[in-house]
Amino acid sequence: MVLNFLTRVFGSSNERAVKRLQPLVDKINALEPRFQKLTDNELAETTASFKLRLANGETLDDLLCEAFALVREASWRTLKMRHFDAQLIGGIALHQGIIAEMKTGEGKTLAATLPAYLNALSGKGVHIVTVNDYLARRDAEWMSTIYNFLNLSVGIIVHDLNDEERKKAYASDITYGTNNEFGFDYLRDNMKFDRESLAQKELNFAIVDEVDSILIDEARTPLIISGPAEKSTTLYAQTDTIISAFKKDIHYNVDEKAKSSTLTEEGVALGEQLLGVENLYDPSNIEILHHLNQAIKAHTLFKRDVDYIVKNDEVVIVDEFTGRLMTGRRYSEGLHQALEAKEGVKIANENQTLASVTFQNFFRMYKKLSGMTGTAETEAAEFKKIYDLDVLVIPTHKPMVRKDFPDLIYKTQKEKYQAAIQEIISLHKKGQPVLVGTIAIDVSEDISDKLKKRGIPHTVLNAKHHKAEAEIVANAGQRGAVTISTNMAGRGTDIVLGEGVKELGGLHILGTSRHESRRIDNQLRGRSGRQGDPGSSRFYLSLEDDLLRIFGGDRITAIMNKLGIDEGEPIEHGLISRAIENAQSKVEGHNFEIRKQLIEYDDVMNQQREVIYRQRRQILTDSDLSTLFKDMIQDQAWQIHAMYKNDKQHPMEWDLEGLKDTVKKQFNLEIDLSPAVCEDIDADALGELIETTAIDAYKAKESLLGPIDTQRLERYIMLQTVDSLWKDHLLNMDHLKEGIGLRGYAQQNPLILYKKEGYEMFEGLVERIKEETLGIFFRIQIAESEPLEPIQKPRQENLVFSHSDDSNVKKPVKRAQEKVGRNDLCPCGSGKKYKKCCGA
């Protein structure tokens, strides 16, 4: 009571927020005569003037009123469309990083031109995000008339563009595209090997159309670029069968401290003999060599019932510190498969994620984010919690006069559909257009069959063909039209009423079920009553509908029985309407919790992703990587030193042979640790000796190659190593997330465990990147002095770009270097010809 009284006196918080923007709207309107007097050329030249003022210290907010007035005048001259005050308010909200709820037909597309133009003046780019290629192309081509008139460029990002076309589109002042393409381009850029081929600029400002669909409905499904993890699991089994022939200290050496094993020359020869391979170090056999090394490691360093157990025909890791089973965790780099082969259980063959990101985390990377939709208010709490976005309901240009009738509830679905069909026929005979909303395609087809039998002409909207969809929806307001569609279909296209339809009551919306979300129901209703047009809506429900059956069907059935409702008779009752709304609120709350939990888990991966991608971008763009390499050499030198250091012993008493072997393995160099050297040396001096010896070896290689070729080689090796280990890490993190909830940890939060173990795994990843990068760099042999040929991209898998089941886009990428010719570049990355390097 008190709250209602205060709202009547002071207005709602939304009304107050709108009122605060009114002075800006008044200023824009006051500027209109000034811009009307300018010639076309003078209007266009104003853009350069605005940019100059920005460069001289003014802000976008300082320019807002003039910029909006300019765009309004340009829109009128080019499209004969003038922004209403409601669109100005919407534009201001979008510029301020707020979600603007604008009802259907209120001109969201035109409203977006205002903040898009203003923010494009900074030169940092504006992305306007839509739900499909058709809308992206339509809106870009339509609105580009305004932008081009004002000397701004427009790009379009749609499916099937090549790298050069994408780069050009992103270089534009304003870029239209789909949420999927913007997200995939972010991932693609972080898999590139050449800085010149990077497409996206920084993520500056995004205006997301149908923001509720993209940031809420699609938030639970990540964008994934994947490729096959292995060609086949047979190689694991094949290498496992020959391991018994290998003898310790003859065919391989084991370093238990470093938990590593290495093949000797005799071991390599035996492997070649048993596997029927001429040269295990031939580039085409590197994969076989890797499998052989992992098989030896599995048999010699990992013990059953100590390091792992076999449970339900699966190899499960045992935590070495707690002794607990680490369900869901897998060893990386094929080691887990080698253990599976050793134990004779099924060897996992997985489609490996190469890169992934959720929409939640992708769009939070923009410096400024805003969005628009016809229905956002019911999800305002989620937008605030997840994205820190406020929602502003924009007043309609004309009052809403649509009549929303109470729901009709029947006992059975059969009765419900009979009544709905009868209503459709009745309205069709009257000439009033009807849009029938369903929650599933099969329901649409069932209603279509029933109407065909009654001889009622109608159109079924197929959401798979966006262009056809838009045309069908646009015609849904014609006299006598009957259109059947799923509730979500046809968004982005206004339904314009045909001649004489207003007099018949406008477009009638007939919903055949309530959706789990009130927002989706409101979207369906919102198709009618645009810009003050008449219209009506009603939902037909039954006690057999999922929502009612699962949430409170028994209670509603009892009410209907008490009221003595006969078969075929509907009920309209406020109590039942409230029960349905309560059911929807429960489901919405449940789905919100799922999405919140998803982002809590994905935030762990996102922090790691940002570190790796930032490091990768630095490697790609820095002109000099020598400092980075020297830092890695220093780190690894002192880590090796720490492995063998014993504060209670003089260095002469350390395991110097083991230390020498580890230095050899990491840096491919012999270090003099003879008694003459070590006798008068302390622990720190020995660490410095390892570091300086490795740095000197690095400088010698740099001198031999020359600085330019060294840079190219370093960049290639490091990018390839980062990508290879990162994809393994993604797989391991997936397994961790899947299995973390199955652990038997009493009273422990799975999320906390995931964060802790994920961090430990990430630390291990960073160390492995250093180790492998330096190991490869120091092992590359320079056969003779000749100019390095341009280093090519590494071999790529067949990539799969996936978001949801119906939008998988397979892009086969041709494998390179399946067979290496004598005059081809050596696959090891040295930049030399194969015949002068590994094939010598």
Swiss-Prot record:
- Give the matching Gene3D superfamilies: Helical scaffold and wing domains of SecA (1.10.3060.10), P-loop containing nucleotide triphosphate hydrolases (3.40.50.300), SecA, preprotein cross-linking domain (3.90.1440.10)
Q: Record the organism.
A: Desulforapulum autotrophicum (strain ATCC 43914 / DSM 3382 / VKM B-1955 / HRM2) (Desulfobacterium autotrophicum)
Subunit relationships: Monomer and homodimer. Part of the essential Sec protein translocation apparatus which comprises SecA, SecYEG and auxiliary proteins SecDF-YajC and YidC.
Q: Where does Zn(2+) bind?
A: C826, C828, C837, C838
Task: Please give the NCBIfam families that the UniProt record associates with this protein.
Answer: PRK09200.1, PRK12904.1, secA
Q: Can you tell me which family this protein belongs to?
A: Belongs to the SecA family.
Alphabetic keyword roster: ATP-binding, Cell inner membrane, Cell membrane, Cytoplasm, Membrane, Metal-binding, Nucleotide-binding, Protein transport, Translocase, Translocation, Transport, Zinc
Segments spanning the bilayer are none
What is the protein name for this chain?
Answer: Protein translocase subunit SecA
Tell me which InterPro entries the record gives.
Helicase_ATP-bd (IPR014001), Helicase_C-like (IPR001650), P-loop_NTPase (IPR027417), SEC_C_motif (IPR004027), SecA (IPR000185), SecA_CS (IPR020937), SecA_DEAD (IPR011115), SecA_motor_DEAD (IPR014018)
Q: Which Pfam families match?
A: P-loop_SecA, SEC-C, SecA_DEAD, SecA_PP_bind, SecA_SW
Q: Which cofactor does it need?
A: Zn(2+)
Q: What does the entry's cofactor note say about binding and number?
A: May bind 1 zinc ion per subunit.
Q: Which CDD domains match?
A: DEXDc_SecA, SF2_C_secA
Q: Which PANTHER family does this UniProt record tie to the protein?
A: CHLOROPLAST PROTEIN-TRANSPORTING ATPASE, SECA INNER MEMBRANE COMPONENT OF SEC PROTEIN SECRETION SYSTEM
Q: Which PROSITE patterns match?
A: SECA, SECA_MOTOR_DEAD
Give the span(s) annotated as Disordered: 518-537
Write down the EC number.
7.4.2.8
Question: How the protein sits in the membrane?
Answer: Peripheral membrane protein
Stated role: Part of the Sec protein translocase complex. Interacts with the SecYEG preprotein conducting channel. Has a central role in coupling the hydrolysis of ATP to the transfer of proteins into and across the cell membrane, serving as an ATP-driven molecular motor driving the stepwise translocation of polypeptide chains across the membrane.
